[in-house]
Amino acid sequence: MKIDLNADLGEGCVSDVELLTLVSSANIACGFHAGDAQTMQACVREAIKNGVAIGAHPSYPDRENFGRSAMQLPPETVFAQTLYQIGALAAIARAQGGVMCHVKPHGMLYNQAAKEAQLADAIARAVYACDPALILVGLAGSELIRAGERYGLVTREEVFADRGYQADGSLVPRSQPGALIENEEQALAQTLEMVQHGRVKSITGEWATVTAQTVCLHGDGEHALAFARRLRATFAEKGIVVAA
């Protein structure tokens, strides 16, 4: 069995360099919620050094709230902003001899695109316009995955090690109780259940079906690195290969 392990990088976390030794894919902030041209260059350089797949992590223009504010922008605006961000990272990667492989939206852009078909379409269209060979990463079973498939993109369905799930397979909003899993044992058990058995227990106790093709590790938690190492070790014990 094979699984991709991804992390969001270039967002000001000191653990970026160490995380790049543990993951197979990096989602690099493109300046709209965090990061800038220099952090993008640095992350690309380290990703290439570690053989990690390079991906763009576009966001709403919302540095003040780290891309976590809901917005209602016209689809053409979202298309242009997404194309702008992924195009910038693609150029930076190319200049360093690397290749951008995937795109994963950030924060509220990701969450809204999981449920709003028009928004999802604008993002998928931007990815396709930049490079039809790019992989589009989105929440398992979401509108974003369906939009990517309509454009003929390769999609990658994502699950989260440390996030609570609702009965419909969507994430518990960060503003609500149960959104974040603080207990390491619980996060490990949830991840294995999703990867090995394709299901996750919701905060209300029901099982939701999920397709796990990539697991997101958040690099901004207090114990992020220790958990990442433990998850890698657990995957190795179970014969699960980590690869993009």
Swiss-Prot record:
GO terms for molecular function: 5-oxoprolinase (ATP-hydrolyzing) activity; ATP binding. It comes from the Bacteria. It catalyses: 5-oxo-L-proline + ATP + 2 H2O = L-glutamate + ADP + phosphate + H(+). GO terms for biological process: carbohydrate metabolic process. Signal peptide: none annotated. Keywords: ATP-binding, Hydrolase, Nucleotide-binding. Pfam families: LamB_YcsF. Disulfide bonds: none annotated. Its EC number is 3.5.2.9. Gene3D superfamilies: Glycoside hydrolase/deacetylase (3.20.20.370). Forms a complex composed of PxpA, PxpB and PxpC. Catalyzes the cleavage of 5-oxoproline to form L-glutamate coupled to the hydrolysis of ATP to ADP and inorganic phosphate. Belongs to the LamB/PxpA family. This is 5-oxoprolinase subunit A. It comes from Escherichia coli O7:K1 (strain IAI39 / ExPEC).
